[in-house]
Amino acid sequence: MAVIGVEIRDRVEFNSGSSWGNFGPYERIDGIVEFGVDPKNQANSRIVDLQYSPVDKNGLVKFSSDFVLLTPSKSKPSRLLVDIVNRGRKRAVSDFNMSSPSLIPSANIDPGDGFLFNRGYTVISVGWQYDVYRSDALLGMEPPKVEIDGKIVKGMNLVEIRPYEKIKTSLLANRSHKPYPTTSTDNLTAQMYVREWEDGPHREIPCEEWSFAKEINGIVIPDCEHVYMESGFQPGKIYSVVYEASNPVVSGSTLLSVRDIGSWLKYSGVDSPVKVPVKYAYAYGISQTGRLLRHYLYSGLNLDESGRQVYDGVLPHVAGGRRGDFNHRFAQPSQQSSPGFGHLYPFSDKPTKDPYGRKSEGLQDTQKILGGLPKVIYTNTSAEYWRGDASLSHINLEGTHDLDFPKNTRSYLFSGTQHVPRELPQKKDAGPDGSLGLYGFNVIDFRPLLRAALCNLVAWVERGEEPPESKVPRLDDTTASTIHAVLEIFSENVGLKTPDPSQMWRIREIDIGPEESKGITYYPVREGGEYPRFVSAVDADGNEVAGIKMPDISVPLGTHTGWNPRDPSTGAPNQIISMVGLTNYFPSTEVFVRPDRDLRKSNDERYSSKKEYLEMVTKSAKKLVKQKYL
């Protein structure tokens, strides 16, 4: 058993002792779990650099993770749900219990309507990301270090800087996480590049124009954790700093923490706060951690050190078709945009041929060979298709035909939605990277569909009930389309400003060097041919025709997308803001003054009355419930 100890830091009644369904009150337990893994155990053999970590007297590599556990205090839980936190933030309860969506991390847990608790779930949120600044609100981990022959380990690293306003100093890290400092403030062996758009050419910035430094009270001082440019980093441009870093950690220990926290509670291991083993365990990851779950399966890690299956069901949400920076030297777990290990083939669960020379391979191949393959339900929004990678999970890499999903897999597009659920009233604020969108953000709250996906996964695992069929854009029924074709409809029918399709995200073949198998790369990686990009086709209103259509789409009051052009104030107005969509309402009446080229019918032309509209919404919702999508 890889869990060797636990420290309970707090144990309290949850939500003032509220009782939930047939399961009674819950308790909240905050603590730190300590892992000890055997680097010689075959179950750990695919973790990069684990063999270079110090071991204790028992030959174990040790590391630890923060956790927050919610479990019935007086009854047996029905099942285990492991919430793999997103950049330190707990997400499962807010996503499934429909509490007010917020991107602001908090130590508190809003129980929402109690959806999970009324069904008896034990929910554990586990910290796994080692570069998170840990706090009461953000869960992280203490990873093992890499030590080779007693020498300092050095290697190349790349940090991306994406300013939404002009700045002179930037942290040498992805977002606001802990940086890998440069080994020297002398930048003569480092490089800084800039490109105008995601797939644009790199231009090197002369080393005389920038430095490893930061500005404090108008004084520029050398600093190993920051970069400085007197002329300023310009909003909307994409900068990359390539430099030598040192003292890497075993990044793949993140994957082991996900595996072993599930095994610990499922099988009631050492000092488990859940005294009764649970029969079924599920893992949920969103965005970054959805990609982590894809990486977990690709690495064949769903058997613990004792050879037991850990997760019976896995729900990667808004992961698209990619993996991530989770198991290589100097990995940055939050990094997802710059080409690297997370952009590598394969993208689909079923083996498919790579047209650029790699063998035919599938995401689940290793896990199938080893055993312990879970049931998997993927859920994506339109945003993951518009960033160029989601369709790679189910359309072949020549872009000529659809791929079938394996028997253990379903995949659903939530039509016309953006990366995170929103709520009314509509907002026009900053996206995840601080950039502003040109239009008001997408208002669809898709969490009722996410609930259905979890319920279907549970029914599939525990009762053998097949989930409804996958709902994704397909070539064979023309519900898959090109970005160019969809944007043309928006230009001709909807009257919205559209982004330049040549400046949008795409995934390319990449070469990361001869030491790829060792988890070592060079930067910037060499990029080759482009993989095809498909999105859902749209109707005359600009609403998507593929996927699961909530009443917002099937009985619309406006156009809803997974993309939104950048506001000119944040630079690059011909590109889209990351992860954010838009909602643009129909004219309320036929005589409503509308923009040029807006040919959409008014609400008065669509619905004879509010009563008729609500009846149509009810009918649409009931149909989705009957089909088990809602």
For each feature predicted by the language model, list its residue ranges.
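C-terminal His-loop and adjacent cap/lid subdomain of alpha/beta-hydrolase
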Residues: 2-630
